[in-house]
Structure formats: structure tokens, C-alpha cells
Amino acid sequence: MGYNIGSYDVIVIGAGHAGCEAGLAAARMGSKTLMLTINLDMVAFMPCNPSVGGPAKGIVVREIDALGGEMGRNIDKTHIQMRMLNTGKGPAVRALRAQADKFAYQHELKKTIEETPNLTLFQGMVERLIVEEGVCKGVVTQAGAEYTAKTVVITTGTFLRGEIIMGDLKYSSGPNNQQPSITLSEHLEELGFDLVRFKTGTPPRVNSNTIDYSKTEIQPGDDKPRAFSFETTKFIMDQIPCWLTYTSTETHRLIDENLHRSAMYSGMIKGTGPRYCPSIEDKVVRFNDKPRHQIFLEPEGRNTQEVYVQGLSTSLPEDVQRDMLRTIPGLENVEMMRTGYAIEYDAIVPTQLWPTLETKKIKNLYTAGQINGTSGYEEAAGQGLMAGINAACRSLGKKEVVLGREDAYIGVLIDDLVTKGTNEPYRLLTSRAEYRLLLRHDNADLRLTEVGREIGLIKEERYERFTNKKLQIEQEKERLSSIIIKPRPEVQELIRNIGGSELKDGIRASDLLRRPEMAYEHIHLLVPSEVELSDEVKEQVEIQIKYEGYIEKSLQQVERMKKMESKKIPVDIDYDAISSLASEARQKLKDVRPLSMGQASRISGVNPADISILLVYIEQGKIARVSNQ
């Protein structure tokens, strides 16, 4: 017999990286919010790599921060090392990556949640949803407790019917040997959701005291203070290095000889694994021409000897893992502390979601994170933030928020999921974004702070600092456009010293900055600013001036795309009534139910001819008759 515990505006199921962002966002927006998790000791836990950021992912963390989310602030307080990646490349692919103290990260974020008004954290396993006439009204826990709510967000990670697999050993479990969520997965199927089976994996952890670091290459953090969050003013300078080593021919021989014992190759694993994070078995088989593969040794925290062996994700048996580790330079005498394993879990087919992350099947129910078929903490956190924002908006009677592909990598991520779906764990890459020159690490605050303020997640003090930064950027750009630099001897000398061509006549400072060999600091030496500018302002001025032409082209592409996005498609359109559509296109359109012609054009299997037919059909005004049938 169930018993009612209480009523909330928003209930979040799960307290991983998606759940934490969802719960915090909803509560901070003024919604009475409840977070339910299987184990309070696992809030914000990092079950796999102890890091945040990297290519594309680091930009997502910046976007989360610009919108008012927590991940950036939290990693800034708890990292052991931070590095800017791809500094030798263009600004579109630069990204920050932090090595986390995973235990400090977890403790700090749990503390933030516990201290947040409007937010209640409780240990309990949700087994089913309360659904009435296609509307989600709350949840029921294993203990029989009923919690009613205006909206519910599911962020269950890899817990849904989770199974850990290692060699021929297979048992029901969530990550890190936690209790899995089996009944909720079965309940979602009963409600009519299509589920898929995915797989991911993690490498072994080893004892730092047993590593011979003299045989490895040190990988230090950056000397320059770095941060993900716009709010961070105190920087951690006491950094801990990572270390680089490689597999050997002996490693590969051992793996080849034991492939039949790997769950990946014995048939034990049925789920689809991540393409961009393959197991060491996969790497050895698929890239058998490579004599070695990189292995990074990453400390898991400041107060532990556990080291994460990045690059060695595996489902081989324990004895093979131990032998394999000892074939790697520096690890000849290593002691393994935890085994690597593969984990299979259920995910929903994400084309069953609207761009708000609300499910199409059940109103007021949202999903975010690995349940939507993604991999990675950052992808989960970005979805969790948006799902929490939209669940709160619905509960408060406000308009929901959808980020476009031109607005953010988070927008690219969600649009890919709900429009194209995924047949493998989805990882965000810079190559997935058409407008990546617009979606840079350095301008996330300029793109999204206004959105965060409108939502109610950006405080006034921060907004004032942001507007001051924007003003300084514009004023400095105007200053450089108004100053003429003449070919004086000191000017010519500086230009010669950096390998440039001497001036023949006077030139605007902004035009001189457009030269590939010129940096803002060179211009500043010639025409210094009277106002002291931050490094972030200087960087923004240089990028906006130097890449102005390319940025303008991207903005023109965005405008063309927006014309297609502005052509709306009625939700209840009857695609069967459009006889000239190709059968594959008709089925895909019925499955996805796109909201605009732009979204329809991105569906796999819908070609330009189908789009033209659909466009003509809508413009002829037949929709009303179809809708009224």
C-alpha cells in the first residue's frame, strides 16, 4: 500500500552529473524541488575518468557556467591540474581540460546541493511513475512512498538494468558495484517507451606507490591560471602532474592470446559500445598495424594513491588485466587496486523527445544524460541543466528554453539526439557543429549569459561584470579601428622581428592586427591602451578582429538556416496524407515529428526532394483539413 509523502514542483530521479544540474537549476529558479537517488554517497560521483572538459566537452562546461549551471564552478574548486588544449590551432577547437580530485568534486557538489534553498535531497529508489491520462504526476519509490509533482526529470545514468561484465563474469549492478535500477526500466517499457541496450567501460585503477614514474613522461598542468567559470577569482596553483606511457608488443600479444576471454569478443556483451572510447581489446584488433597505444596515468585525487589508467578500458578477466598492466613501461611491478569492467545498461531512443527534453509520449516527463544515449559527464550535465530549466519553466508557467545549433554545443547535442537519434553512445565532437567558429570556448559567456539571466540563474553582480567586459571589448575594437599606425622605425623593427612585411603606408591598428603574424600584444606595444584590460578582453578583441570575415560568413549561414527554422510544421500533421513523400521519409517524419522545416531537413533518410514536397504541401494550406480529420 502506497503512502503520500509530499508534493513538489519538480522531482529529479538520480543525482549524477545530469541530476545535479537539473535539481540545482530548478531550485534556483524558484521551483520546490526533490532529488531522489539510490545512494547519497554517490551524489556527483565520477565512476569513470577523473576529468572534466576536453575538445567540445570543455566548451559545454563553459556554456553550462554561462547559463548559471554548477559544473564549471565546482571543478574550478576541486581540480588537481588544468590545461588548455589545442593552443597551436585556431580558436574554434581550443578547449580547457581539468584533472579532477574526484572525491573533492563529489563532496563539494553534494555540499552545494545540501545548502541550496528549495532543494531536498533524499535517498530512495524510484520504481515507477504516477501517470494519469498521459501526464506524469509524480513517482513511487521501492518503499512505497508516493511523491506528487508538476514535472519529473529522469537522470538515471547507467543504472537502468545495469550489468557489470568482466571476462565470463556477469552480474546485475550499477556503476562501481552500486545497486541497479531494474523495476523502473521495466516500467518505462510498460509505458510504451522504446529502449536500447548500450555498453560502456572503465579501466583498472592502480596503486601510485608501485609505479616507476622514471619510465614515463610527465604531463604537467599549465603555469597560467585557468578556470571554467566566469565567477572564479581564486586559482589552484598547487597542481599534480599526470604521466604518459605506452602499451608494448607484449601487451598486444597478451591481449590477442586472451581475446576469447574478453566479454567484448566472447558474445557476453550485446550492447553497443562508444565509438570514440574503444576498449584496449578493440584498439589492438582494429588498429593492429600500430605497435603501441598511449596510456595516461591520472591521479584520482590529492588524498588517495589510486591512479586511473586512461586508455586501458577493458572487459578482460581480472588475471589478464593484472598481467596486461605489468607489460606497460613503468607498471612492471604495479599493484592493481580496482579491476576494469564493462557495463551494459538501458537507454531510451532519444527521438522520443521534444527539443525541450520532454518526452513526446508522456507530458511533464523529461529525461537527461546517459538515459538519452549519450556518454560523458559534460554531455550529461548540459542536458540535465536544460531539462531542469524546462521542467521548472513548466512548473512555473513560463516559456520553455531551447538552444539552437547556432547558440551552443548544448544545442547541437540535443538537436542531434532528438532529430537524428543515435545507435551508439553519443559523444560530442567539434566536427558535429556546423558553426563551430561561433561556438568557441572563449565566447560562451557572450553567447549565453543573457539567456541565463532571463531564466533567473545569473545573479546581478555577475551580470554587471559581464556587461562591463562586453563594453570593454567593443570600446577597444573601436579604438583600434580609429588609430592609424604609421611606418615609424620602431614599428618596422617590430614587424621585421616577428617575420612580417614592413609597412609602406599608414594602416589602421585593427587592419594590422588582421595579419597572421600579429597578436594583440604586438599592437599593444605600438599603441597601448590607457585602460587596463583583462587577458580575456584582449583575447576576445584579437579573435573578433582577426577572424571577422570568417565569423561574418558563419553568421550569414546561420541566417539562411533560421529561414528554414522559421517555417513551422504542425505537430499533428498527417504525413500519410502526403502521397508523394518517399516511404522512408514518411516513416522517419512520423517517428521524429519535427517542429520546423530546418529540423526536418536534418533527419537521416529525409532528402531535399522530400523537404520540397513537404514545403509545398504546407504552403498550400492543406494542413487544417488534415488536422481536422
Swiss-Prot record:
Homodimer. Heterotetramer of two MnmE and two MnmG subunits. The lineage of its organism: Bacteria, Bacillati, Bacillota, Bacilli, Bacillales. The keyword Nucleotide-binding does not apply. GO terms for biological process: tRNA methylation; tRNA wobble uridine modification. This is tRNA uridine 5-carboxymethylaminomethyl modification enzyme MnmG. SMART domains: GIDA_assoc_3. It is found in: Cytoplasm. PANTHER family: GLUCOSE INHIBITED DIVISION PROTEIN A, PROTEIN MTO1 HOMOLOG, MITOCHONDRIAL. HAMAP family: MnmG_GidA (MF_00129). Its cofactor is FAD. Belongs to the MnmG family. Keywords: Cytoplasm, FAD, Flavoprotein, NAD, tRNA processing. FAD binds at G14, A15, G16, H17, A18, G19, V126, S181, Q370. Its main location: cytoplasm. GO terms for cellular component: cytosol. InterPro entries: FAD/NAD-bd_sf, GIDA_C_N, MnmG, MnmG-rel, MnmG-rel_CS, MnmG_C, MnmG_C_subdom, MnmG_C_subdom_sf. It comes from Bacillus cereus (strain ATCC 14579 / DSM 31 / CCUG 7414 / JCM 2152 / NBRC 15305 / NCIMB 9373 / NCTC 2599 / NRRL B-3711). Pfam families: GIDA (PF01134), GIDA_C_1st (PF21680), SAM_GIDA_C (PF13932). Gene3D superfamilies: FAD/NAD(P)-binding domain (3.50.50.60), GidA associated domain, C-terminal subdomain (1.10.150.570), tRNA uridine 5-carboxymethylaminomethyl modification enzyme MnmG/GidA (1.10.10.1800). NAD-binding protein involved in the addition of a carboxymethylaminomethyl (cmnm) group at the wobble position (U34) of certain tRNAs, forming tRNA-cmnm(5)s(2)U34. NAD(+) binds at residues 273-287. The keyword Transmembrane does not apply. GO terms for molecular function: flavin adenine dinucleotide binding. The gene is mnmG.
